[in-house]
Amino acid sequence: SKIIKSKIIPIFVSKLQNMIKLGEYNILKVVKIVDFGVYLDGGEYWGEILLPKETAPAECKEGDELKVFIYFDSEDRVIATMTTPKAIVGDFALMKVVGTSRVGAFLDWGLRKDLLVPFREQREEMVVGREYLVYVYVDKTTDRIVASTRLSRFLNKTPVEYELGQEVELIVARRTDLGYNVIVNNSHEAIIYRNEIFQPIIIGQHLTGYIKTIREDGKIDCILQKNDGHEQIDRLAVLILKKLEENGGSLAVSDKSDPDEIYRLFGCSKKNYKKTVG
């Protein structure tokens, strides 16, 4: 049976990739309307794919083309939905753990069937109720959509010729002793140093940033402001004034306060706080 399985899987994967984009949006034609939904043309391999009534358009007819998300339901049937998931295959997204079992943790990704993070794909043991930044992909051995918190292995390790000062899209991935690890343009890993952060940021947040340095080892440093001088200080000053107004003109912090308390309130280092307040 093992030999048969090893022969079947590559064919299955090939068919899957060629016919339907699992975990992504597909444009499929309505071929039949029934009481419990509509059937869509999934091609020669998949045949008719059900779009259940609860997510199907109220008015549609045979021959209409619908943009649908394709995944496996709880009974491992290929199924379509017009509900928008929190992420599709190839995305990084922040999701909450809603359950655990002997196979892994389950995330709420906006669909009826929760998204599995297998134990081997957990950077640390995942806890119900907590949110994690995950990468969504198709497991090639099972052909199931799963997620992983082991983000680094899905990022490009090949150095890219970014230009210094180039504007890039960032996703905040993880807090470290030095600052925050971020994902650059959905592709590369970089760091923003704590003493160069002048605003509160959270895991999973999407930000616009800029390339500050590309080191000899290929590692990337980013900043959130185009200039690393007065502009950041001005932004921090505005934030401090806003906090003062919200608290009747006084704050329970000073340049003698604990650095972590200053960071919690203003998202900056104690050094930058002192520089701003004088």
Where are these regions (language model features)?
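Single-stranded RNA-binding regions, centering on S1/OB-family and related RNA-binding modules
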Residues: 3, 9-278
